[in-house]
Amino acid sequence: MSKKPVMLMILDGFGISPNKEGNAVAAANKPNYDRLFAKYPHTELQASGLEVGLPEGQMGNSEVGHLNIGAGRIIYQELTRITKEIKEGTFFTNKALVKAMDEAKENNTSLHLMGLLSNGGVHSHIDHLKGLLELAKKKGLQKVYVHAFMDGRDVAPSSGKEFIVELENAMKEIGVGEIATISGRYYAMDRDNRWERVELAYNAMVLGEGEKASSAVEAIEKSYHDNKTDEFVLPTVIEEDGHPVARIKDGDSVIFFNFRPDRAREITRAIVDPEFKGFERKQLHVNFVCMTQYDKTLECVDVAYRPESYTNTLGEYVASKGLNQLRIAETEKYAHVTFFFNGGVEQPNTNEDRALIASPKVATYDLKPEMSAYEVTDELINRLDQDKYDMIILNFANPDMVGHTGVQEAAVKAIEAVDECLGKVADKVLEKEGTLFITADHGNAEVMIDYSTGKPMTAHTSDPVPFLWVSKDAEGKSLKDGGKLADIAPTMLTVMGLEVPSEMTGTCLLNK
């Protein structure tokens, strides 16, 4: 007998904006989406700010979006949690942070603070770095060095100089800290095993090798002069009298202040992992603190903010009912439909199958806007024909990953490719008498230009996202307004005929 699968399709970075200018979502020819939108119930969901556990007005992101969707409740993010602790003062007694600083003081070694320098709030926040500098000052440390990763992706592409100036002013005011290196996140924060990039960032921080400059401002200005925006700044060593300001050495303390794990793992492994094989390097012995848990299998690090655990996430609850589920995405978003969707748990649930389709190896995704969407779709159709799954979670990475390039024509092509795939998937699910919910985790591709400057916009947005209910049972029915991402899981469970567990505080969006 054919199963009637309930599927959630997440169009990553597909937001809704009334403004048509620079809007790749509106500009794209998407007959399949339009057809489903016209025929089936739909509403808009909030995917940013307090509705997803972020600070008010903070744009959403993929990690946060998938956590909220999978948990069926608002998940207070590390960003909100750490900022709150700095305000309340408990940050300054955090055991792991205090221990790393005390050891640097006792052993007369250096403290290195590394991470993404911006207020983007996706991977890090400059205020957390300022908090660490204040703590270092309180502890009486003098040898404190910052290894700044330049952003240009979650914030404007050439805003890095402003953040460097802001940091230098803060260090002056607090009375401690010097910038030792700067590197574009393209190098320091790779997540796709492109070790030749990571090696350049590592060499700057540890060996003092790479581009040279007499100040961080000089380094970033040179980069702009060479037409390299923040994300692509070549790893640069800041020198004084012909010598590096500082290098990470044996016995030093290192605090990595990024709170989002996925782009923090590779450079961390390069520094601390005794089994590291990415490139040739000598083993360092440092006191290393990760702001959050980047990887459970890394035992040689301390963690400042351990993950909170969540019971009865959507995947766990469906598994407890003896049902089969599938998670499917290409490499760029695979962690999102598995690890993040499961509330930060790496281990699959019972009867949870996973299909990983490799993302194309291109320098930037505007060069291949369709990415691996067609391959993901082919694999999904094959799996649907097996009649095995009760629930399927699917992610199309294109609107987000191509949206990040700032190239509008490419983002339009990305959405058109996804629409083609969406049509095939919807037809197959309807053929199986199943239900397809279509949504997004946050906005991006609907705003491809910065309206204040007219320049390309590469960051996420705070726009709402669509929520469509595609099913024979849905015709003529309606969905509630005023929803948020946390309402999706209770809605799916209701359609599956399952009771919503008490831990899920989201609301079912079906109008009775």
Swiss-Prot record:
GO terms for cellular component: cytosol. Binds 2 manganese ions per subunit. Mn(2+) 1 binds at residues 400, 404, 460. GO terms for molecular function: manganese ion binding; phosphoglycerate mutase activity. The active site is at residue 62. Gene3D superfamilies: Alkaline Phosphatase, subunit A, BPG-independent phosphoglycerate mutase, domain B. It catalyses: (2R)-2-phosphoglycerate = (2R)-3-phosphoglycerate. Keywords: Glycolysis, Isomerase, Manganese, Metal-binding. Mn(2+) 2 binds at residues 12, 62, 441-442. Its cofactor is Mn(2+). The keyword Manganese applies. HAMAP family: GpmI (MF_01038). Catalyzes the interconversion of 2-phosphoglycerate and 3-phosphoglycerate. Monomer. Belongs to the BPG-independent phosphoglycerate mutase family. This is 2,3-bisphosphoglycerate-independent phosphoglycerate mutase. It comes from Clostridium perfringens (strain ATCC 13124 / DSM 756 / JCM 1290 / NCIMB 6125 / NCTC 8237 / Type A). The gene is gpmI.
